[in-house]
C-alpha cells in the first residue's frame, strides 16, 4: 500500500541515500523497502523492544532508542521519513518537530510524513489498545514546512490508493 509513495520519495533521492526513519517501529514494511532499494537507514523509535527487532532483522542498518521530540543526531540525511509516527504527537509537539526535521536536513533533503486530514485529536485502537492521534490543519503544516525551508512537492488527503493516509512530500531548499 505504501510502495507508490515510497517510490516517489526514493525518486527524489540520490542513489544509496541516507534516510532518517523517525518512529520506525519494527521496521516493517518501510525500513525493509528502503533497505532493499539501497538506502542506508538510521531508524529512531522510543520503544526499546521495537529497536531490538530492527537490530535483529536489519543488522546492517543503524538503530537508536530516542524520543523524536528531542532528537539531535548532529548530522544531516538525504531523506527524512515520519510514516505513521508523527501524528501520535500532540499538536504542540508536532509544531516543534519541524525544527527537528530542519536540523537533520541538508539542501535537497526529501521529507515525507503522514498526518490526519484536518485539525483535531482522536483516540483510535491498535491491537485492542487505545492509540492517540492528532493533526494540525493543512494550512498550518504548509506554513511550518515553509518556515523550516521545505517546499511541498505533493500532498494528498486521505489517499484511497494508500489506505486513506494523508501524505506530505516536501523538499528542503
Please report, for each region that a protein language model flagged, where it lies by residue.
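Short "lid" loop at the C-terminus of a central beta-strand within the Rossmann-like core
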Residues: 116-121
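A short glycine-rich, Lys/Arg-flanked "PGG" loop and its adjoining helix->strand segment in the class I
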Residues: 95-107
Amino acid at each position: 500500500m505504501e510502495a507508490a509513495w515510497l517510490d516517489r520519495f526514493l525518486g527524489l533521492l540520490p542513489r544509496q541515500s541516507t534516510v532518517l526513519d523517525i518512529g520506525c517501529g519494527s521496521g516493517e514494511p518501510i525500513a525493509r523497502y528502503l533497505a532493499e532499494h539501497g538506502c542506508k537507514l538510521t531508524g529512531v523509535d522510543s520503544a526499546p523492544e521495537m529497536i531490538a527487532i530492527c537490530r535483529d532483522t536489519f543488522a546492517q542498518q543503524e538503530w537508536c532508542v530516542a524520543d523524536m521530540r528531542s532528537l539531535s543526531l548532529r548530522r544531516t540525511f538525504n531523506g527524512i521519513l515520519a510514516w505513521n509516527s508523527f501524528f501520535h504527537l500532540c499538536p504542540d509537539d508536532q509544531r516543534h518537530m519541524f525544527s527537528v526535521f530542519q536540523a537533520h536536513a541538508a539542501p535537497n533533503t526529501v521529507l515525507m510524513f503522514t498526518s490526519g486530514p484536518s485539525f483535531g485529536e482522536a483516540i483510535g485502537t491498535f491491537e485492542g489498545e487505545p492509540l492517540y492521534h492528532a493533526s494540525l490543519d493543512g494550512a498550518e503544516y504548509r506554513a511550518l514546512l515553509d518556515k523550516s525551508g521545505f517546499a511541498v512537492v505533493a500532498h494528498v488527503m486521505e489517499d484511497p490508493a494508500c489506505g486513506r493516509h494523508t501524505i506530505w512530500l516536501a523538499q528542503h531548499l
